[in-house]
UniProtKB/Swiss-Prot annotation:
Family named by the database record: Belongs to the ATPase alpha/beta chains family.
Lineage start: Bacteria, Pseudomonadati, Pseudomonadota, Gammaproteobacteria, Candidatus Pseudothioglobaceae
InterPro entries documented for this protein: AAA+_ATPase, ATP-synt_VA_C, ATP_synth_F1_bsu, ATPase_a/bsu_AS, ATPase_alpha/beta_chains, ATPase_F1/V1/A1_a/bsu_N, ATPase_F1/V1/A1_a/bsu_N_sf, ATPase_F1/V1/A1_a/bsu_nucl-bd
SUPFAM superfamilies given in the database record: C-terminal domain of alpha and beta subunits of F1 ATP synthase (SSF47917), N-terminal domain of alpha and beta subunits of F1 ATP synthase (SSF50615), P-loop containing nucleoside triphosphate hydrolases (SSF52540)
Catalytic activity: ATP + H2O + 4 H(+)(in) = ADP + phosphate + 5 H(+)(out)
Binding site for ATP: 148-155
Key words, A-Z: ATP synthesis, ATP-binding, Cell inner membrane, Cell membrane, CF(1), Hydrogen ion transport, Ion transport, Membrane, Nucleotide-binding, Translocase, Transport
Gene for this chain: atpD
Record's bilayer topology term: Peripheral membrane protein
EC number: 7.1.2.2
Protein name per its UniProtKB record: ATP synthase subunit beta
Gene Ontology annotations for the cellular component aspect, listed alphabetically: plasma membrane; proton-transporting ATP synthase complex
Amino acid sequence: MSIGKITQIIGAVIDVEFSADNMPKIYDALKVLETGLTLEVQQQLGDHIVRAIAMGGSEGLKRGLGVTNTGEPIKVPVGVKTLGRIMNVLGEPIDNAGEIGQEVDWTIHRSAPDYDELAPTTELLETGIKVIDLICPFAKGGKVGLFGGAGVGKTVNMMELIRNIAIAHSGYSVFAGVGERTREGNDFYHEMKESNVLNKVSLVYGQMNEPPGNRLRVALTGLTMAEYFRDEGRDVLLFIDNIYRYTLAGTEVSALLGRMPSAVGYQPTLASEMGALQERITSTKKGSITSIQAVYVPADDLTDPSPATTFAHLDATVVLSRQVAELGIYPAVDPLDSTSRQLDPLIVGEEHYNVARGVQGVLQRYKELKDIIAILGMDELSEEDKRSVSRARKVQRFLSQPFFVAEVFTGAPGKYVSLKDTIAGFKAILDGEMDDFPEQVFYMTGSIDEVRGRSKEKA
């Protein structure tokens, strides 16, 4: 085991000098002898000096401290012993429940599966959320992004998806909290505990208060645990909240590592860093990883390099819109902006496809007519356009839905709507069967039968 010494400390980036015959390799884990802090080698600078990122706070460090080279990358526990536990970026337990006691450790840096190992999938994953199941259906073994600015409901949507999918799903799940609020991590833990699925979930947290090294690597820690379950032949769910913080952590350390910033101040390696993570999140012939990732959109700008880079890797994109949220429609999913590769008549069937396109068509027409209505009023529209507007407003309200995880805030019981009921409901509105119903009865309901029941009560 070779020993070096710290020569320079700049925030989370630390330079260590080793002897010429004991130089660490890139991504090797180093340990500071006095504090036990782990560092990860990023660059070899020459003059026998390596530059490393600290996987923890650098307070208490000083030049001249001894550092050992472990000779291997960061390794984390994998397997069933991680289920029901909360771990940090190094796989160390942070839930005061004793050691993990794992039989196997895996390194967090792994190559993506080979092409011949990949297994494409067309099987749909029902979420019970109407707007998602209809407009941007998820594939089992696919990658989904929840895009949204600050405060439009990414985490609440993520929680509802976890509740609906993880509870109905008999397999294992991994949740990686990347640079998000500690309170949300705590809420999530208790939500899982109350739902009795905690024994099927591994939790890995590197929250907002952590140094950038932790936030940069915690997604890889969670992904490594998911890959192990997949390679055992299981179908795994991987939830990442929030992928933007992964990019942001890379930006924080990039300048300290001496790289020139690129567009909007992001690191020049943004695309390759994102690719290295996303290409590993895939399904093979052994098992599948279905991944749902929250993506923060800075200043609601979808063309920002970080969300724009993420788009390229996803099978379905759920775009949460501030304009929809302002109307009081939750989940605030924009049905005209959200997309899915699965929305294909050969995969979802003709009826589902036609109803989804019909819903988008009527909402698009309403959007086009809004200016005319604002200037001239509804009376100037043709009868056909009046009918379209009326149906669009009903569709818009019917896209809202009370969530189980929001019951404590709204007081309304959550609703799970099957895909069959979702298609039947929107088809009834588009076919004119609901033309005589007032639009307010469609707001915050589950199935179309509930709308009919509400209307009778009001009558």
